[in-house]
């Protein structure tokens, strides 16, 4: 989150086992807690956190740039989708949690038709 997505660590608690991170939009968006040998997330459909989404810009060029940076850092892009209202890349963080890196599409689409948020997902090619 810090090295590849630009989050800044703003502090630690629990004797250094938890770090608060911010993208600069608010006091913190993430609180990551080290839990030792805890099992990873369950596979497939499950209860709990599905994924987090992080907006990286406002254009497909910015999403392409993010994809290139992530791939150059050795991150595997597991999928890419066009959601009509946004375009997204999907990857896993080091703990196996799914992270969606996205840019918003034309806001007039969902403002004119709020149901566009649940439009069928289309493939995205970058």
Annotated model-derived regions:
Residues 14, 44-46:
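Short glycine/proline-enriched turns and hinge-like loops at secondary-structure junctions
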Residues 33-37, 104:
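Acetyl-CoA-dependent GNAT
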Residues 52-98, 103-108, 121-126:
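Vicinal oxygen chelate
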Residues 111-112:
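An amphipathic, aromatic/His-enriched active-site/gating alpha helix that lines ligand/cofactor pockets
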Residues 47-51:
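Short, solvent-exposed beta-strand edge segments and adjacent coil->beta transition regions
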Residues 1-34:
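Core segments of cupin and vicinal oxygen chelate
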Residues 37-43:
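Short beta-strand/turn micro-motifs at beta-sheet edges
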Residues 117-118:
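A short alpha/beta connector and helix-capping loop motif
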């Amino acid at each position: 989150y810090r090295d590849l997505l630009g989050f800044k660590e703003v502090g630690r608690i629990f004797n250094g086992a938890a770090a608060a991170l911010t993208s600069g939009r608010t006091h913190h968006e993430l609180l990551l807690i080290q839990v030792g040998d805890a099992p990873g997330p369950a596979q497939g459909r499950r209860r709990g956190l599905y994924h987090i989404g992080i907006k990286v810009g406002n254009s497909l060029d910015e999403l392409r740039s993010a994809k290139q940076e992530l791939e150059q850092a050795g991150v595997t892009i597991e999928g890419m989708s066009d959601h009509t209202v946004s375009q997204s890349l999907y990857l896993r963080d080091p703990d196996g949690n799914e992270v969606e890196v996205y840019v918003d599409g034309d806001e007039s689409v969902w403002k004119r038709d709020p149901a566009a948020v649940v439009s069928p997902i289309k493939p995205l090619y970058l």
